[in-house]
């Protein structure tokens, strides 16, 4: 897409000026200006419209119809260049260079020079002038022909007429909107006249129409007076308006044809001839009168009159009316009358039958002295010639013949090709402004072949004759195809033909063409006043001898001078009539309507008589002149007569020969007649073409010589200019290059300056930021140094711990050797079981007797199981209420019952277990003191001592552990009491349960909302409702263990017996002691909501201890890393946080009591229950067999202080679903890959024996079911939440875990040392005294939270303060610190 490119960029002054003009025109801020918007500005530049249109076409490259700022600037540059030098060619080079001065615009300046016409024509050109009567008459006639009798003209018809004006559609639309006052879509006569008048003003580039007004003024509408024109009453006059001839010829750059047309088209409806018009007509007459004879013959006048494009009949009528002297020559008077009548006819006014009296009385004609009264008519009457004297005419409206010998070249013309019919011809006939204007200079000089040249100056409207050198006339450009040889029938016509060779030179000098198209004029009747034609005077010339071919304008050869003179006359007339306004009014006092009606006939007769008198007076005055001319004419006529006589004789001689041929050719004459006429026309055309070509050849020869001379001069000038241009171009390029370089350097320097400024600002900002960061980093470095020291100290402590644990590993190796020795002893003790077979047989017999009672008890157990489920739900609700700090209503009763039951249980347990109490206590004390478990226990006791009552992280969390403990104790109590299980006391169970939910101060435990275990439980148990129970369970276990260590130790076996029986018991006691040492603090394994398996296991301690013949590596696995698998945490059905039960303790208690073979129904129930809970790695059938074998050696356990809790509720184990859940739990735990599982020891012979004797045992011989449970606990606590090391020690104490410390989030840099988990055996409080080991690392939830925040870059003080503000909520404290950072 092409674009505007300035070789010389716009200067700052130009940019400011052009931007100002552009924004004034772009009122809507669209970035473009339309042609309609810039038209007033361009018109005010004073340049011609054609130049402005070329400027627009040059800058509007894509023909968009609008200009952007760049194109608008280019247009104003071109206007400035053209204002400085108007003759420059229109091209893109005008806007590429800078003009010497900016374009000047004046809104009151006319785009073209206007002629003043007279001194009184000082009117404001920006106002729309009033309509002249001439314009009203022209446009009224056009309306009548278009409307055809209708009162309005339809929009489509008016559009067709308007479009022929070749104005922009937008301009025509605005004119229509102004004229269609009622928006009806049709125009009445006044609206049509106004529209045509505005179109005429636009075409003439009148300043008032540069910007059409929004509303036409009222006085402009009032200037339209639609009075009918009366043509048969010559005394009725219409006053001249201020603009009698319009403004069509005022502002146009007129050509010869337009000036000539204006001479025939500018006539007012009045019949008075002004002095100015008379002067114009006289000037035309003088230009035609080359010989200065004072008269013009028909040979000159006929071609001139034909150029008016009136038909021949109308011209004959005008000739008849104007020829007041009744001769073949016109004087200035007759010529003025004929021209006046032609103008009237072209204006659409019907010609009268006689010359109006007002025309004859015009002062300009000089026929009458000035007299205001029309009654005083003393001038002699002149006979008015009638139309009867005119010879017969052949009306050829489209063709006019010219003499065949006419070889005079004519002036070239630029005429629009229009047809002779339709509204376009009417429009063009009425107003020559509708033709496209051709650019000419302000002054048009028309030259002819004489020494006179006619010059018309558009500025002052005056026509002058200047003496110039003779020049070759311009060639003909019109077609002469319509010319033919004319043979007149009258003697006068033949004399004219004879004189043609003499008149040819005159005809060549007087021919001209005109462009006006005449409208059709109806024929007129003969004049009512007839006169006798003089036989001695020549008749009216025949206008049919000249033809005008369709589509081409032809005339005789004097058009240059005549056209200029006619145009000057028309322009002068219009200016004179506008300036004189009311100078000439009708002086007839009787011109009013009534008087005119009465005197019309008398006036007509008087006018005729006056014409006759004037004609006779004139004839008398010119008799002498005519006498001399008559003599010459007689001589010429005589010669012509002789010539004709000779021709006549020749014709007579050939007449006889042609008579015979005439009869034969008469039939062909009619057919060939048309062909002859066509051939004659073609001959005339050929002759005309020949003469035109000859004249054109002469002209071209002259032009060629002139062109060659001018070409040589131009070449020389071009050479000089090219050299100058080359030098200037080189200089310009150098300057442009320098300007570009300088601008580039300026741009680069400015960009570098901006960049440097930005860089300096950024560097300063970075320096400030780095200063702040340095201070922060120094603070952080100090904190990190402090933290590094702390980590180093902790690392040293961990190294010490690792060394200590290495020493303990050595001790464990020694312990393993001892255990191997003990295993050997246990194998020896297996022989003792054979001694008990007989005893077991007896027990089986007794069991058969109690079978009936078992069935009854079984039914009761099922019922109690339902009650137990309800109690469990009730207890859960109570526990939730307790966790929320709500005490039940019967809290006091429950506490009292719990205390009584505890005392009773303690007494019974003491009475049963006092046999071996002393020996067991000694063994346990010795063993515990010598083992490495004591150190861990001492540590736990020290940490518990250090804890405060307000520690929300580590204690006083309500748990459900008391429930399980109560169940275990109750189960043992039920086993000891035999038939007492049939009627358990639920009230005692609730009291024991409530007692477990109280702390050592008797206050209900409040659950810690910020505990790391509660808030960060594993994913597998986060949604489990049993989580609060497991949290409560842990603290309850710890508190109960601390309170009851002394009582429990009294039931633990500890040393070897001397007798075989006691040796067997001692072996079992030693084996059980190992279990105690590994898991003394894990009180229970809550595999299900009920305590079925645990109760069953506790009722058969002897059997559970029997298969414990394991190696040291199995019971105490070597130290290894703790691998936590999140996916395994949910492998079991109950992914709860559970503790183990103190089964080994109960087992040892029962081993200490003497063997009493007293089978009970409870033993049978728990035997079946154990079968439902297979140990890990064993099948149910294997467990069943082991249970049966173990039943032969079953003894009653010693009842401790918790034996009465939930007594008799073990019957719930009958439910198959619970057993299945427990079985699934043990299987899942076994499959979880626990590293703490004990190896299954098979004793096939013992199992078979127990099976055969139907021994009711409570524990399978394959493994201890309490061992796999810690693995579940270990997996469920693998959540990455920070849990206190103390909590883990308490939960997993005694399990032999090889990893003591959980991964610390806040201290990732501390190396993880393989430290075994601390074992927490149950020892007396007096044994827990020892040195406190400072771990040196964060182990509590608080310290872990502080350390985690410290690892995020905050100081310990900030972390501690934030945690205190947020109630030790790590997430809230983190957000608080980040927000306040």
From Swiss-Prot:
Changing residue 1352 to A: Reduced ubiquitin-binding. GO terms for biological process: actin cortical patch organization; endocytosis; endoplasmic reticulum unfolded protein response; endosomal transport; positive regulation of cytokinesis; regulation of protein localization. The modification Phosphoserine is found at residues 241, 244, 248-249, 265, 419, 495, 848, 931, 950, 964, 1008, 1012, 1020, 1069, 1087, 1093, 1095-1096, 1100, 1181, 1187, 1343. It is found in: Cytoplasm. Keywords: Calcium, Coiled coil, Cytoplasm, Endocytosis, Isopeptide bond, Metal-binding, Phosphoprotein, Repeat, Ubl conjugation. Residues 1127-1139, 1214-1226 have a biased composition (Acidic residues). Disruption phenotype: Random budding pattern and morphological defects. Defects in fluid-phase endocytosis and defective internalization of the pheromone alpha-factor and uracil permease. Deletion has only a small impact on actin cytoskeleton organization. Deletion shows synthetic growth defects with thermosensitive mutants of PAN1, END3 and RSP5. Residues 1338-1380 form the UBA domain. One of its GO terms (molecular function) is calcium ion binding. Residues 593-882 form a coiled coil. There is a cross-link at residues 674, 1329 (Glycyl lysine isopeptide (Lys-Gly) (interchain with G-Cter in ubiquitin)). Residues 905-919, 937-957, 1021-1036 have a biased composition (Basic and acidic residues). Functions at the internalization step of the clathrin-mediated endocytosis (CME) as an early-acting scaffold protein. Requires clathrin adapter proteins, ENT1/2 and YAP1801/2, for normal spatiotemporal dynamics and viability. Binds to biological membranes in a ubiquitin-dependent manner. PANTHER family: DYNAMIN ASSOCIATED PROTEIN 160, ISOFORM D, EH DOMAIN. Belongs to the VDP/USO1/EDE1 family. Present with 1380 molecules/cell in log phase SD medium. This is EH domain-containing and endocytosis protein 1.
């Amino acid at each position: 897409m092409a674009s505007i490119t300035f070789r010389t960029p716009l200067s700052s002054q130009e940019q400011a000026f052009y931007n100002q003009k552009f924004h004034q025109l772009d009122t809507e801020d669209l970035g473009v200006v339309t042609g309609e918007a810039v038209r007033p500005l361009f018109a005010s530049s004073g340049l011609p419209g054609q130049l402005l249109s070329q400027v627009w076409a040059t800058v509007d490259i894509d023909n968009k119809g609008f200009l952007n700022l760049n194109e608008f600037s280019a247009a104003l540059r071109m206007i400035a260049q053209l204002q400085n030098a108007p003759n420059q060619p229109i091209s893109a080079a005008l806007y590429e260079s800078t003009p010497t001065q900016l374009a000047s615009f004046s809104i009151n300046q006319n785009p073209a020079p206007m002629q003043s016409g007279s001194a009184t024509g000082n009117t404001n050109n920006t106002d729309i002038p009033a309509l002249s009567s001439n314009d009203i008459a022209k446009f009224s006639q056009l309306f009548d022909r278009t409307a055809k009798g209708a009162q309005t003209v339809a929009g489509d018809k008016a559009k067709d007429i308007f479009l022929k004006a070749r104005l922009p559609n937008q301009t025509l639309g605005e004119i229509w909107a102004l004229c269609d006052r009622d928006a009806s879509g049709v125009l009445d006569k006044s609206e049509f006249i106004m529209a045509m008048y505005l179109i005429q003003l636009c075409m003439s580039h009148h300043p008032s129409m540069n910007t059409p007004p929004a509303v036409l003024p009222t006085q402009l509408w009032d200037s339209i007076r639609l009075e009918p024109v009366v043509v048969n009453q010559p005394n009725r006059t219409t006053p001249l308006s201020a603009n009698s001839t319009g403004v069509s010829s005022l502002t146009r750059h007129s050509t010869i044809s337009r000036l000539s047309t204006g001479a025939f088209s500018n006539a007012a409806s009045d019949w008075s001839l002004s002095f100015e018009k008379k002067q114009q007509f006289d000037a035309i007459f003088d230009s035609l009168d080359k010989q200065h004879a004072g008269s013009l013959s028909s040979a000159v006048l006929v071609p001139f009159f034909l150029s008016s494009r009136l038909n021949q009949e109308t011209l004959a009528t005008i000739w008849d009316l104007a020829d007041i002297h009744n001769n073949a020559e016109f004087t200035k008077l007759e010529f003025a009358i004929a021209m006046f009548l032609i103008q009237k006819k072209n204006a659409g006014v019907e010609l009268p039958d006689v010359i109006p009296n007002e025309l004859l009385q015009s002062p300009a004609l000089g026929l009458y002295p000035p007299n205001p009264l029309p009654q005083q008519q003393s001038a002699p009457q002149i006979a008015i010639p009638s139309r009867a004297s005119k010879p017969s005419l052949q009306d050829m409206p489209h063709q006019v013949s010219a003499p065949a010998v006419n070889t005079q070249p004519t002036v070239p013309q630029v005429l629009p090709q229009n047809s002779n019919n339709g509204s376009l011809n009417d429009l063009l006939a009425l107003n020559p402004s509708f033709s496209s204007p051709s650019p000419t200079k302000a002054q048009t000089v028309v030259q002819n072949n004489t020494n006179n040249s006619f010059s018309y100056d558009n500025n002052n409207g005056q026509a002058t004759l200047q003496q110039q050198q003779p020049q070759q006339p311009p060639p003909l450009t019109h077609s002469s195809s319509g010319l033919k040889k004319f043979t007149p029938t009258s003697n006068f016509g033949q004399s004219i033909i004879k004189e043609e060779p003499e008149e040819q030179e005159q005809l060549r000098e007087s021919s001209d063409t005109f462009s006006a198209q005449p409208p059709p004029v109806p024929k007129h009747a003969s004049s009512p006043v007839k006169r006798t034609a003089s036989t001695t005077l020549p008749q009216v010339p025949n206008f049919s001898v000249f033809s005008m071919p369709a589509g081409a304008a032809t005339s005789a050869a004097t058009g240059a001078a005549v056209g200029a003179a006619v145009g000057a006359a028309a322009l002068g007339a219009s200016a004179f009539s506008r300036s004189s306004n009311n100078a000439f009014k009708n002086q007839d006092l009787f011109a009013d309507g009534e008087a005119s009606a009465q005197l019309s006939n008398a006036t007509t007769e008087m006018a005729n008589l006056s014409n006759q008198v004037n004609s006779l007076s004139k004839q008398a005055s010119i008799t002498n002149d005519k006498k001399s001319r008559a003599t010459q004419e007689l001589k010429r006529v005589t010669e012509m007569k002789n010539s004709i006589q000779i021709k006549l004789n020749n014709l007579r001689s050939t007449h006889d020969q042609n008579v015979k041929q005439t009869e034969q050719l008469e039939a062909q004459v009619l057919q060939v007649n048309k062909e002859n006429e066509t051939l004659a026309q073609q001959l005339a055309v050929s002759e005309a073409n020949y003469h035109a070509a000859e004249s054109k050849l002469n002209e071209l020869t002259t032009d060629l010589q002139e062109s060659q001379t001018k070409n040589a001069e131009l070449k020389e000038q071009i050479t000089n200019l090219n050299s100058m241009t080359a030098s200037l171009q080189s200089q310009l390029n150098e300057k442009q290059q320098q300007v570009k370089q300088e601008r580039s350097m300026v741009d680069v320097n400015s960009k570098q300056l901006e960049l440097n400024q930005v860089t300096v600002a950024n560097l300063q900002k970075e320096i400030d930021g780095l200063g702040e960061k340095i201070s922060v980093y120094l603070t952080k470095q100090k904190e990190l140094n402090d933290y590094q020291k702390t980590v180093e100290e902790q690392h040293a402590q961990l190294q010490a711990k690792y060394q200590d644990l290495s020493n303990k590993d050595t001790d464990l190796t020694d312990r393993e050797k001892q255990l191997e020795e003990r295993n050997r002893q246990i194998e020896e003790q297996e022989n003792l079981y054979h001694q008990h077979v007989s005893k077991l047989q007896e027990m089986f017999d007794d069991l058969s007797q109690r079978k009936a009672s078992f069935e009854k008890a079984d039914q009761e157990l099922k019922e109690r199981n339902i009650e137990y489920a309800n109690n469990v739900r009730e207890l859960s609700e109570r526990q939730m209420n307790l966790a929320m700090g709500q005490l039940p209503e019967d809290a006091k009763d429950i506490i009292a019952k719990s205390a009584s039951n505890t005392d009773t249980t303690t007494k019974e347990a003491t009475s049963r277990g006092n046999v071996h109490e002393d020996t067991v206590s000694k063994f346990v004390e010795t063993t515990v003191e010598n083992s490495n478990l004591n150190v861990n226990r001492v540590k736990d006791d020290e940490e518990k001592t250090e804890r405060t009552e307000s520690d929300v992280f580590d204690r006083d969390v309500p748990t459900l552990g008391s429930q399980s403990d109560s169940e275990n104790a109750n189960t043992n109590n039920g086993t000891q009491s035999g038939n007492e299980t049939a009627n358990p006391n639920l009230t005692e169970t609730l009291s024991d349960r409530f007692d477990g939910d109280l702390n050592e101060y008797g206050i209900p435990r409040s659950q810690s909302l910020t505990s790391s275990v509660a808030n960060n439980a594993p994913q597998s148990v986060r949604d489990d409702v049993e989580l609060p129970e497991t949290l409560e369970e842990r603290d309850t276990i710890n508190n109960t263990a601390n309170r009851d260590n002394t009582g429990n130790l009294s039931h633990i076996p500890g040393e070897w017996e001397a007798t075989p029986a006691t040796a067997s018991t001692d072996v079992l006691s030693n084996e059980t002691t190992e279990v105690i040492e590994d898991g003394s603090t894990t009180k229970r394994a809550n595999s299900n909501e009920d305590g079925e398996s645990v109760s069953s296991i506790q009722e058969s301690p002897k059997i559970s201890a029997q298969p414990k013949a394991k190696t040291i590596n199995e019971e105490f696995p070597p130290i290894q890393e703790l691998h936590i698998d999140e996916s395994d945490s949910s492998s079991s059905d109950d992914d709860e946080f559970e503790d183990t039960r103190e089964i080994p303790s109960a087992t040892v208690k029962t081993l200490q009591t003497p063997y009493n073979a007293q089978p009970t129904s409870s033993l049978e129930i728990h035997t079946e229950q154990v079968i439902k809970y297979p140990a890990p790695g064993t099948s149910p059938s294997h467990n069943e067999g082991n249970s049966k074998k173990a039943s032969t050696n079953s003894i009653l356990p010693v009842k401790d202080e918790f034996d009465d809790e939930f007594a008799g509720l073990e019957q719930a184990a009958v439910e198959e679903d619970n057993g299945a859940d427990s079985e699934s739990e043990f299987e899942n735990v076994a499959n979880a890959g626990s590293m703490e599982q004990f190896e299954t020891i098979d004793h096939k012979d013992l199992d078979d024996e127990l099976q055969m004797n139907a021994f009711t045992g409570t524990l399978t011989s394959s493994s201890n079911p309490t061992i796999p449970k810690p693995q579940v606990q270990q997996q469920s606590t693998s959540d990455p939440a920070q849990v206190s090391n103390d909590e883990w020690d308490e939960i997993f104490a005694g399990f032999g875990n090889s990893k003591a410390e959980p991964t610390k989030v806040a201290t990732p840099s501390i190396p993880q040392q393989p430290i075994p988990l601390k074992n927490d055996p149950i020892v007396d409080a007096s044994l827990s005294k020892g040195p406190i080991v400072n771990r040196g690392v964060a182990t509590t939830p608080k310290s872990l939270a502080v350390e985690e925040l410290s690892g995020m870059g905050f100081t310990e003080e900030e972390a501690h303060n934030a945690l205190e503000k947020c109630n030790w909520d790590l997430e809230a404290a983190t957000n608080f610190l980040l927000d306040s950072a």
